[in-house]
């Protein structure tokens, strides 16, 4: 097939270390890309590109399985997951596997099974990747036309998009199936401190589900990150699953409209840029979810959120000083505001001190102590349960702090155990990777648009000093 880009521009980009190293269809002269450009050499070799993608999937699944078994091997049931640096077992626990009331791990065998299944799957994918990379046909169009494609074929591209959407939708519906019929999922809001619960009545109201989409991302609104009950979570997956399945079927059966054909760039690099942009957005959303949300990411497994840890400290000292005789309803702090309790801007009774900034935090261990107007003084005096005290004391000392500035009043101790919360790891990694993927999106989008417009801006390589230097070997 004729190349869709100019080879001339690439000839002077890179001098091969070994000019005699030639692999059919994968050398610099025939593809315009040097060895380090990776899959770019396979742009027009659909069979080999399939091998690269299957092998990549195998590597991903291998990591998941190996890391899963590593975490199982190192897991200590007596300590909370977030104290052990775990990031995979909390996800399995959130799905309701191996845990009971209060998030206590009662069986690690499901975690072992998960790891083994992923390892076996990775072996199958790895074999497929090696086969298609080395043995299988270089292009699929002739032998397997259903799996073959041409990047410019708009109808085929939207068919592939549709297949992907159907698979994503089925994945979302699998969670609905697990929550509704296959044992339930962990609900941190279950009475008494969380438990595995079958979600018998997921939210189906479009006003509620799409209301999250229409909310502001700022302040106390929080967009979709503000979801605070499992009914809405599972109902949202039901909606998104059905939309993806039916949207996928639509894209399989139809051809793109004229406005879509004109609006988009239809090339392999353009599709790469669209994908990178989408993954970037998902990375940023995941960052916010794991940092702020304690429903989808239960604190029993991931540790408390920052505001939750700050509120937990205020609660812990209120409990202590109340037992020592303090009148927590009227005691003044050093600023003249309430030391333990004060009023929010809208009149609710909230915790006093520096944690006042987090007055609208919601957490399962504190909600039972609220009344119609914020914290209930009578409940604080008479109804505090031991599990609430234990949990808040634990959360107070495991804040996801990694900042050099204010920490919401949480006491920091230079001699403390070196603790980094999984929330810190996961939110930071997803933010950083989301940013990198966004830059990659801009890079490939710019190249794709330039190529489509008939020009590619870049450094003039004809006078590159490197070209006149003696090769290192």
Curated annotation (Swiss-Prot):
Location, primary (coarse class): plastid
Transmembrane region(s): 69-93, 134-155, 178-200, 255-275, 291-312, 447-471
UniProt subcellular location: Plastid, Chloroplast thylakoid membrane
Annotated GO biological process: photosynthetic electron transport in photosystem II
Membrane topology: Multi-pass membrane protein
Keywords assigned by UniProt, alphabetized: Acetylation, Chlorophyll, Chloroplast, Chromophore, Manganese, Membrane, Metal-binding, Phosphoprotein, Photosynthesis, Photosystem II, Plastid, Thylakoid, Transmembrane, Transmembrane helix
Modified residues (Phosphothreonine): 15
Cofactor remark: Binds multiple chlorophylls and provides some of the ligands for the Ca-4Mn-5O cluster of the oxygen-evolving complex. It may also provide a ligand for a Cl- that is required for oxygen evolution. PSII binds additional chlorophylls, carotenoids and specific lipids.
Single Gene Ontology MF annotation: electron transporter, transferring electrons within the cyclic electron transport pathway of photosynthesis activity
Keyword Lyase: no
SUPFAM superfamilies membership: Photosystem II antenna protein-like
Recorded GO CC terms: chloroplast thylakoid membrane; photosystem II
Binding locations of [CaMn4O5] cluster: 367
General function of this protein: One of the components of the core complex of photosystem II (PSII). It binds chlorophyll and helps catalyze the primary light-induced photochemical processes of PSII. PSII is a light-driven water:plastoquinone oxidoreductase, using light energy to abstract electrons from H(2)O, generating O(2) and a proton gradient subsequently used for ATP formation.
Assembly notes: PSII is composed of 1 copy each of membrane proteins PsbA, PsbB, PsbC, PsbD, PsbE, PsbF, PsbH, PsbI, PsbJ, PsbK, PsbL, PsbM, PsbT, PsbX, PsbY, PsbZ, Psb30/Ycf12, at least 3 peripheral proteins of the oxygen-evolving complex and a large number of cofactors. It forms dimeric complexes.
Protein name from the UniProt record: Photosystem II CP43 reaction center protein
Provenance organism: Nephroselmis olivacea (Green alga)
Species lineage: Eukaryota, Viridiplantae, Chlorophyta, Nephroselmidophyceae, Nephroselmidales
Gene: psbC
